[in-house]
């Protein structure tokens, strides 16, 4: 990655971020850009419950902090909605602080997540979901080689577009 570093989340640091950006900074030594904490606070109750029970980093479950190399600040969060399923399907998700949007960072992150999934040797398909309209998120996925495969209703009964990419196969095991 050219501009960013992905740092696997340590559960206690994510719990600190839920508490406050200052608590996260004290726990991790990294500042947090405006807007990042709000993405985590809005996470599902299941994710928050799993986080409270966890003791070790798990990129498939808890993802990564997106650290801007020059500014040395967490500009977003990214990861997967869980480990690959029995069909080798994994879903990616990412968010970037409004102060850092529009600079290509989401594209850099999406590519890194696809590379991570591919290098696991366990993933056949990477998917993502967007609002059902052309926007910055759809352009990110198109740049990364995803193709729109359909429309579905999400768990909150909102129409979304489903995007998929078949990453190159790898023989390593993450």
Predicted regions and their residues:
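GNAT-family acyltransferases
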Residues: 1-91, 96-99, 112-116, 120, ...
